[in-house]
Amino acid sequence: MQNRILIVGAGEIGSALSGVLKKNKNNRISIWDIDPKRCYPKMPLEQMVSHTDFLFLCIPSHAIDACIDKVKKHIGKKTFIISLTKGIERKKGFLTSELLVKNFGKERIAILAGPMLAEELRRGFGAKACLATSNNAFKKISPLFSGSILSVEQLGDIHGASASGVLKNIYSLGLGIAAGLKMGANARGILLLQATKEMQILMLQFKGKPTTVLTLAGLGDLEATSSSEYSKNHATGLMIANGKKITHYCEGDLSLPLVVKRLGKKKLLPFMGAISQVAHGKKNPRKIFEGLLK
């Protein structure tokens, strides 16, 4: 019996995930995208989702609300929903995991998070990620990756994994700014540790566990994203540091004001506060970032 898989979002990570899952001959993969040319087969999303066993969400965070509205009336009650979306909802500041649990219940929701850069997956480099979900869902979803370059391990903290994805994007942006300022490896080590500490503190504000930060979903993904030439968060940080016009948007930059709004400015910790000041306050980046080292 084949696994009927639908990937929503044919961007970089959606396309890379499709290549990974195709390694398992038991997987039958369909793709839906807002661009009709990228859809396979060419069918409405509502129709495709009604004939799937596993739904993978690989869409930008700003599109998650609209996607849920489209599929929730048509998706099967036994379909598992796995999200790779790393962001925060714009209206009320909900995590992707919070929205999914609210609409579909906790037992069939999973968050796939870890160091799995799309470019490296496409090039055949091995990767490993956390599949944050219930025991039953993990038993059903994990075999999809059998024989592929991506291995998964279970994590019980769904909201923590989702929050880690949001926070690591913001801190990757900050570490990109530090790299653009050419602050050196010592400074990077200091700021990486500070980011880790702040993520652990902030995790409680997102219903997650501080220990989740020290998993593949947290520190593992943060290190990969903050140091890779393929990372949009890193690239955006470099542009901000050098006073260049932002030519593309990244999840870290988009999520930052939403996280600030959810937490409140008084609860901002030093590194996140510095990133907010530099990215959106247009303050002197070198002066502010060097202040973090004292």
Which residues does each predicted region cover?
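NAD(P)-dependent Rossmann-like dehydrogenase/reductase catalytic/cofactor-binding core
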Residues: Q2, L175, L204-K294
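Conserved active-site and cofactor/substrate-binding residues in soluble primary-metabolism enzymes
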Residues: V8, E12, A16, H62, ...
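NAD(P)+-binding Rossmann beta1-loop-alpha1 motif at the extreme N-terminus of oxidoreductases
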Residues: M1-F54
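Rossmann-like NAD(P)(H) cofactor-binding subdomain of soluble oxidoreductases
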Residues: L17-S18, L45-F125, I141-P143
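Internal alpha-helical scaffold of NAD(P)-dependent oxidoreductase catalytic cores
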Residues: H74, L99-E107, G126-T212
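General beta-strand structural signal in soluble alpha/beta enzymes
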Residues: S83, R108-A113, V152-G156, T215, ...
